[in-house]
Amino acid sequence: MKIKGVIGLALGVVLGASAASAAEVTVVRDVLGPEGPVLVDGALYYVGWVSGTLSKWDGAKSVVLNNLSGCGHNGLALTARKTFLLACTDDPGSVLEMDMTGKLLRRWNADATGRPFKGGINDVVVTANGGAYATLWGPSTDLPTAVIGGVLYLAPGARDWGQVADGLDYANGVAVSPDQKTLYVSETVGNIMQTYTINADGTLSNRSNFALLNLLTKNRVDSWWLGPDSMKVDAKGNIYVAQWFGGKVLKLSPQGKLLHEFDIAAGDGTTNIAFSEDGNFLYVTVVKDPNDPQARGSIVKIPNVE
């Protein structure tokens, strides 16, 4: 999640939240704009959108692998080639491909027609066949304005991205079902999640409303920006979505039913999730105060639930 200036001031009083798990442990501190956690071979990779960094935590210490201005590091995904795709939210946005050491291998600044990625790229996910989807965000202003969000697709072996969905209100997180037939997309403005059918050629159809989060959980504050951020899907097809300004992670069934609510004590700006290798724990990136322009935050580890 990245919003320039004052980050969407909340207009209401914070609602009482259920007690956070006593087992919540902070594993990484002092991250400026924590996002994009990915666990690879026991190491946790993550980004800072304010610091413009890609870092690696080995269980004891963090090392910065990449420090690149003009990107606004955000979503991160691992490819089958053991490279990273990185979403850049600076407007216009970019998608970067980097090796595991943070070395830049490739940069896309426009789609196949030459159109710049207006609104910035927010998140990215890799499919089982080697393709990838990325979300187009929107103007990073104090209050949301133009509805220009969409979804881009990079087909396996293709040179360029093509747009496969539009008309989304600040498209944010993106994820794929285990059977590779459904694409989940979060619209932060509106506090809603959408689904699409993934066609054989990677195009999308049958856009449908999946979950309206304020019907599943009480809003913690009144804010334009309270809504779903990034998400991950487990092997059973359950969706774990971070709620920006909500201070929580929601576990949803493939049918959109709320299965569990994880309240995060470390802050209200939950942004993303990674699973431990055995699936028994979640690593959650969280900003303490979403109104903080520096987006000071951390990564916490919490137990998962069945």
Language model regions located:
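Bacterial N-terminal signal peptides
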Residues: 8-17
